[in-house]
Amino acid sequence: MTQVVLGENEGIDSALRRFKRQVSKAGILADVKYHRHFETPLERRKRKAVAARRKRRF
């Protein structure tokens, strides 16, 4: 869980920026995106195959 503690003279804007950066680095939004709907084993294999093809292309 990501937590941001406000400093004594810190504004809300900078704290929000720090929070967004921490969430992005932790990969929380990507995890939520993948768990939004159930992914069948077939869909998982297809997604991984497409990712492997993309990775191989570069």
UniProtKB/Swiss-Prot annotation:
Belongs to the bacterial ribosomal protein bS21 family. One of its GO terms (biological process) is translation. One of its GO terms (cellular component) is ribonucleoprotein complex. One of its GO terms (molecular function) is structural constituent of ribosome. This is Small ribosomal subunit protein bS21B. Keywords: Ribonucleoprotein, Ribosomal protein. Gene3D superfamilies: Ribosomal protein S8. The gene is rpsU2. It comes from Trichormus variabilis (strain ATCC 29413 / PCC 7937) (Anabaena variabilis). The keyword Ribonucleoprotein applies. HAMAP family: Ribosomal_bS21. It comes from the Bacteria. Signal peptide: none annotated.
